[in-house]
């Protein structure tokens, strides 16, 4: 199936790209999500005419996302949870909880679908979490899961010590 992207799609292309994709991927994902349209002759002509508008819109979105990225950069989210004696959580810290806390911290709504967790957070410690802001731009935040505020502060001190040791070794 030949399609034209009307929104940037990670690892696929940017607005206005004409691509061949598997029929199922096009019919079941790209078209229903309004990420693409079928590449018919009238649509191709329309896209050529509107490509500058699409690029301007994408540039505007990218600038807004870069402002959000500046807010997110170096954020540390602390979650205080009850745990067993060996540090395992009763439950887990979910991408929705991370999105809610991050949205609260930066006063901008971040969707839970933009939070990329490599694995579930089920024990205390420090984790790096990726936030997908745009098809071409990701941010990283630090998530600290602890039993108490004092334990969270200990984790932060430990992390700063490790970072300063790494800098000393590289110099």
UniProtKB/Swiss-Prot annotation:
Coiled-coil boundaries: none
Molecular function terms from GO: rRNA binding; structural constituent of ribosome
Keyword Ribosomal protein carried by entry: yes
GO biological process: translation
Gene Ontology, cellular component aspect: ribonucleoprotein complex; ribosome
Assigned keywords, A-Z: Ribonucleoprotein, Ribosomal protein, RNA-binding, rRNA-binding
Record function comment: Binds to the 23S rRNA.
PANTHER family the UniProt entry points to: 50S RIBOSOMAL PROTEIN L9
Membership in a protein family: Belongs to the bacterial ribosomal protein bL9 family.
Protein name: Large ribosomal subunit protein bL9
